[in-house]
């Protein structure tokens, strides 16, 4: 499967139009799934009224559906392979002040501590520390949001990004007990059309069943 953890656009849904053909070509055996990021809500645009803002968000959802993607808005799906199953959970953005927390994990998957292997799509990695590791047994969480602030320095095992001033978990794989978080640095840019060291990233993750 292919998953996308939000921020498909920066300000308005119209930004997606030139890329519809390319993104529609993404296919996977178990489907393409997405969630909304903070930029997808239109919170950074001075809309004429609330209706205009909501209409733009609706347009984004329609376009993603036309591309063959399934957006998970505080909901979940089960994926099967033989006798194995995985619960894929998608929540809306876990906002930081002054923006609201649209995400509702308990609504997306009420039985958060059952035995099913669970993958969570949550745009903001702060969500992992604030709710996921303390109140659930979700095995793997996938996030984005930080972009490593588009600046990363690395020398051997040492690395630095200004993103770590705000986000303790800003890039790569993290573990707490038996729970894992992967933060992808993304492929685009926000406001500044540049990346220094923080090269565009597409992550490939292989899950193996251990009997």
Give the residues covered by each predicted segment.
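Soluble catalytic domains of enzymes that build or remodel membrane lipids, polysaccharides, and related
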Residues: 1-211
């Amino acid at each position: 499967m292919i998953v996308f953890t939000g921020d498909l656009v920066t300000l308005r849904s119209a930004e997606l139009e030139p890329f519809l053909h390319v993104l529609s070509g993404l296919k996977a055996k178990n489907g393409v799934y997405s969630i909304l990021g903070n930029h997808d809500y239109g919170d950074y645009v001075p809309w004429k009224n609330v209706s205009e803002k909501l209409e733009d968000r609706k347009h984004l959802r329609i376009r993603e559906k036309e591309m063959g993607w399934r957006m998970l808005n505080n909901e979940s799906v089960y994926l099967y392979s033989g006798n194995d199953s995985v619960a894929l959970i998608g929540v809306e953005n876990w906002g930081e002040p002054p923006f609201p927390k649209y995400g509702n994990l308990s609504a997306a998957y009420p039985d958060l501590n059952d035995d099913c292997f669970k993958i969570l799509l949550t745009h903001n990695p702060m969500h992992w520390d604030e709710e996921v590791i303390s109140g659930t047994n979700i095995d793997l969480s996938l996030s984005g949001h930080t972009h490593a602030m588009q600046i990363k320095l690395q020398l051997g095992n040492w690395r630095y990004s200004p993103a770590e001033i705000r986000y303790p978990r800003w890039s790569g794989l993290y573990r707490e007990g038996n729970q894992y978080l992967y933060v992808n640095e993304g492929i685009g840019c926000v406001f500044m059309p540049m990346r220094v060291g923080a090269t565009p990233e597409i992550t490939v993750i292989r899950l193996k069943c251990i009997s």
